[in-house]
Amino acid sequence: MTSASEPEIAPDPINWKRNLFVAWIGCFLTGAAFSLIMPFLPLYVETLGVTGHESLNMWSGLVFSITFLFSAIASPFWGGLADRKGRKIMLLRSALGMSIVMVLMGFAQNIWQFLILRALLGLLGGFVPNANALIATQIPRNKSGWALGTLSTGGVSGALLGPLVGGLLADSYGLRPVFFITASVLFLCFIMTLYFIREQFVPVSKKDMLNRKQVFASLKNPKLVLCLFVTTMIIQVATGSIAPILTLYVRELAGNTQNLAFISGMIASVPGVAALMSAPRLGKLGDRIGPERILVAMMALSVLLLIPMALVQTPLQLGILRFLLGACDGALLPAVQTLLIYNCTNQVAGRVFSYNQSFRDVGNVTGPLLGAAVSASYGFRTVFFVTAMVVLFNAGYSYWCLQRRPHQAMID
């Protein structure tokens, strides 16, 4: 019989490196699953009865953007639940929920059903921000930049590989089976998270939860955190503004070429490849010199790369500049996330990261709209000048926010 005075056995410490590895695979699978269906999304919309060029463009834009819109709405709710119930259960909820929705998408019979399911996908999403929150609350603070930079490469890798694999699968098996394959990938993500990610979390009752006002009052620097949310949104606006016109711009540069799709795909992919290489290294550098310096410096360098993109004469020149731009962009969101974790406690990390995700989703919606509007009125090249101005504003805005409190005060 155990003596009453015998000390309790402490639980095994969390192996944060293993959790980081498994979360990376989860983000990779999630990124791949989302991008698997992107190459043929307009084609699938067409099979659901949408005809006519204008109608097809409108519905394709709607089914693409509605996911981000509903994700922005739902993220704060899921973030609050993560702070109450734990981050692992939110990862499981997201992976399983998205898997079920993907199956239903494969059975959609009309465009309205598909649109509703795309909205539901946004409502049930949130794997990546919850993975960020989980890892951010477990890693040593002096390794935050490296760990979050490494984690970000998971989603980027999946997003790079997904369109290629999705296109091959669609050509081989048809459009609907790809949704079922995507659902299987997400279910695999659910199984891996269930068995291999560990979290020691004490659930918090609803009455003991901090409300939104108390969450911001608990932050070390609430104004800076709000500035970082806006910074995240503008980063996504700048990234997304180029997406609608990239293929058309490449066609303008390449002239009559037989392999336009291949060249455009390469130029679209090279920033992600560069981000894979740069994010962990710049994150590690940020741990040494401060993530705020990395953030502002990389945005300033991005401006210098965007301007000549408007002046290039060949696809090769554009590809080289986009590779360098990707190396800069790979450091931006991990630097923001590192600064967020410096300024919040583990108690509210789920909500802070979910608010940041909401701002990111707003940027994902508005960026392509900005690029399309500018190109329609002023031409493709003007988009790069406008995007450079947006990034320049973001660099100045971020620098101003960060100067209001020194780095050491943020991490103490």
Swiss-Prot record:
The chain crosses the membrane at residues 20-40, 62-82, 96-116, 119-139, 150-170, 177-197, 225-245, 260-280, 294-314, 382-402. It is a multi-pass membrane protein. Keywords: Cell inner membrane, Cell membrane, Membrane, Transmembrane, Transmembrane helix, Transport. It is found in: Cell inner membrane. It comes from the Bacteria. The keyword Membrane applies. GO terms for cellular component: plasma membrane. Pfam families: MFS_1. GO terms for molecular function: transmembrane transporter activity. Its main location: membrane. Belongs to the major facilitator superfamily. DHA1 family. MdtG (TC 2.A.1.2.20) subfamily. HAMAP family: MFS_MdtG. This is Multidrug resistance protein MdtG.
